[in-house]
Each structure stands twice: as structure tokens, then as C-alpha cells.
Amino acid sequence: NDSNGDSDNAAFDPNIPVQVSGINPTTGGFGQRLVISGENFGNDPSIVNVFVGGKKAIVINVKNHSIYCLVPSQAYSGEIEVQISNGDNPVVSTIAEAKFEYVRKQLVSTLCGSRRDDGGYDTKDGPFNDCGAFGSPNWLEFDPKYPHLVYVAADRGAGDENEGNGNMRILDLKNQYVGTALTEGDMGGTNRGRALAFFDENHMAVAVDQGDELRAAVYGFTRNREAPEGDERNYKMWGNRLALVNFKACNTVTFHPVDGDMYFNSWDKGQFFKVEKQQIQEIFDGTRTTPADKEVLFQMDNGWEYNIRIHPTGNYAYIVSINKHYIQRTNYDWASKRFVTPFIVAGTAERAAYVDGIGTSARFNTPYQGVFVKNPEYA
């Protein structure tokens, strides 16, 4: 036993090959504790470097027959290399026959935005690491023409205590920059731009929450310039504001992905409205000068706040109730081209909590947007 201990504590010998005989465990993710077994590692952690998948690992301890380290992040390829530096001599390097199977962990981290030390924040354009923060963000939507641009609708009227505003922001994922798409003034002076949807590549609808049913519930905008290129950072690409439909207390807007009709709601009595595609097209074309007609397909009850998310096939939609804490489904009747009376698929009305479960036994607390996953790698 004493001889084994002496052997384990032996210093690195540059005249003897460095060998890796095994790794334990053989699979794991970022931060996994990893033991590399072998010969002639020495006893000095300061001269030993380990790379997993080409990424440098943190070496915790070294003995002549083993190295204890932590798996680095993004070590996808899994090759394990041990390097030993010995003064002015060439670096000794060896690669293990076995590969480490790197398992990606599901992590949530900050993309952009930060608060000041006093807890408040600034609302400003800037790179992801210096863009202030977002006042009451409500809805995210990708630009169909420029998929590296993500729009963020903000409901400044929701009571945020900080310095945010109701401007619609843009996340430029390619250039890692936050810009402004529409100001409160661009949206008719409202600071409650609740959601947005695209009629087509060059026409956008914005749901606004205001209290006069004779004013716009949904505004339409036309793209009047292309996305910025190079070092340019002007994201004001939308103009020619038009009232697509009038009503009050609108929380959401969406378009049927096949038939193209527009759907929006009202918090007032929980109405679920339909507007025909042809009328929206005429407004954008300039052949109709008044807001579109609307039809109530069904309604919930007083003070029902919700978002609508239609499945890409158009076969059905989810109604995500924000203030009633549950999710309904409404199927699409292709013959009549309208959504029918909804039914509950998850949660129970006015029972806010966080509980995993099936159907009405599940619980939500202020659910919001939701998304349908098209890429099977993310399903």
C-alpha cells in the first residue's frame, strides 16, 4: 500500500510516456465531475491541462495515476486530451481512445437586459450587454422576412413601477442589438401595445388596449424600409398607421395561417372576434377607407384577458387565459371558416397555482403566450 501511495504522489517524469487508460463516468454534461485514469500525470495541477471536446476543463486535483476535473460547457465532440507542461521542455500531450459523451443540459440564461444597482432600469437601444431592460414585455414574434429579428410588444399600462415605456422593441439576434420598432406615438399615443401579428411579409397588425370602442383595437402598419445592414441600427421600418378594426380593451391579434382571416379579442366581455381577410386586404390596399367589420364568434365573461395562438395547420387554436389561469382549445370549422365554441384542455378557471397534471387537474399562474414547435429537434 505504501508503494502505491508513493507511486500516486510521484512527480511527472518527462522520460516516460503519458498514457490515458480510462475515464469515469463516460457520459454527462457541463459541470460533471470527471476522473481520468492513466500513467505519469505527476502531482502538480499547475502544469496539467485537460481538454474535453476542445474546451478547457477545470482541473481540481492531480495524482500520478488520476486527474480529477470538471467537464466544461459545449464539449460536444467529446475527445479528451491531457497536456503536461514541464518548464522549457515541449508540452507532452496524449489523447484518450475513449470519448466522453456530452449531454446538453436544458438551461435558462439571460439573453439581454439588466437592472441598475438600485433595482430600477433604463429603457434604451443598445447592444445586448448594454440595452437597459424591458417594461412589461407581453408578446414575442419573429419577422417573417427577416427571421433574425424578434419583436417585443410591451404593455406599459400594466403598472410597471420602473422607467419602461410602451415602445415596441426589436431583438436583432444576428447583431446582438436591441432597437425600437414603434414608439408610443407611432401606435396612436397608446402605451399598451399588447401583441402583434403579420398579415404578410410587409404588413403588420398591432393589438392596442384602450378604453374607447370607437377607436382602434388593432392598428395596421406597412413596411416602408428594409432591415438595417452593416453597422446601421435603425429599426424604424414601419409606417402608414391605419385602424384595421375598432373596439376597446384588446389583448391579442392573430391571422389564420391558411384562410388569412384576422382574430382578436376584448377583455370587456371576453369576446372572440373574426374579421374577414378581404376587408383587411382592402384597407392595406387603400380601397377601403373605414375600419373593417367584426363578428363575435363567442364570448367568455366580463373581464376575460387572453391570448390566441393558432396551430400552423389552422385546424385549431389555443386560448391562453392570462387572468383566469387556464387554457382552452377552439377547433376550426373549415366549411364555415370560423372557430367554434372552445373547451378546456388544461387548468381550471380562476384557480391559480403551479401544479403538474393532466387536463383540468393541472394549474397555471398567469400563462401568456405559448408556441407550437415545428422543429422536431426541439419537440
PLM region descriptions:
Residues 160-168, 212-221, 269-276, 325-330:
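Structural motif
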Residues 142-144, 149-161, 198-199, 205-213, ...:
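Conserved beta-strand positions in repeat-built beta-propeller and related beta-rich domains
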Residues 153-176:
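Beta-propeller domains
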Residues 85, 142-144, 171-173, 221-223, ...:
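Inter-blade boundary loops/turns of WD-repeat beta-propellers
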Residues 2-112, 149-151, 169, 227:
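Ser/Thr/Pro-rich low-complexity tracts
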Residues 36, 104-138, 164, 174-194, ...:
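Gly/Pro-rich loop segments of beta-rich domains
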Residues 57, 65, 78, 119, ...:
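Glycine-centered loop/turn positions within well-structured domains
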Residues 27, 58-60, 196-197, 253, ...:
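Short, exposed beta-strand/loop patches in secreted or surface proteins that constitute
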